[in-house]
Amino acid sequence: YLQEESDLPLVRFTVTGDTVPDKLSPVITNLSLASDTVATGESLAFDIEASDDVSGVGHISFNARTEAEANGPGGPVSYLHGSVHVDHENDSGVFTGEIQVDTWDQTGDWIINHLNISDRADKYKSYSYSPNISETHYVRSYSQYDNDTGQWNYLQEESDLPLVRFTVTG
């Protein structure tokens, strides 16, 4: 590794204007499926309504498990995952995704058991199926900045977002 002085001049610049710090995580307000059933080998479309206060929604991802596995003690055997395309040019607040069900996936009742959302300033929020806290709504997990202490706090609370279930048929 050799280092030597360059002839390029040092460049300095100043950023001006009003800045608004992005301290809040984005929020998912609704999740709706195109149908409550899907056949193996097909896909199931869904819409996620989400918003962010300053920088905008950056990324949304999800996981789904069979109901039995979501309620059971072991790790997932049947597991679906994916992400939602976020179009920054057309940020209407509604993001469309798709769950691809392969021919070998288990038939029966499934639940979207985990959603992650982040904004373009890397603030995130997770929504999880946590039956010990709520059997009807997702539990929201996120970090929140406390202006009084200057610290980030990790919080968990029941959200207003109802759990989403679907059935896979053969």
Language model: regions and residue ranges:
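Extracellular acidic, Ser/Thr/Pro-rich low-complexity tracts
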Residues: 17, 35-39, 46-55, 66-68, ...
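Solvent-exposed serine/threonine-rich low-complexity stretches and specific carbohydrate-binding patches
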Residues: 72-90
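Solvent-exposed loop/turn segments flanking beta-strands in beta-repeat/beta-sandwich domains
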Residues: 51-76, 108-109
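Low-complexity/repetitive intrinsically disordered segments
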Residues: 1-13, 162-170
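Aromatic sugar-binding surface patches on proteins
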Residues: 88-100, 106
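Short glycine/proline/serine/threonine-rich loop/turn segments at secondary-structure transition edges
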Residues: 103-113, 122-124
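Proline/serine/threonine-rich low-complexity linkers at boundaries of modular beta-sandwich domains
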Residues: 13-28, 166-170
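Beta-sandwich strand segments
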Residues: 1-7, 121-160
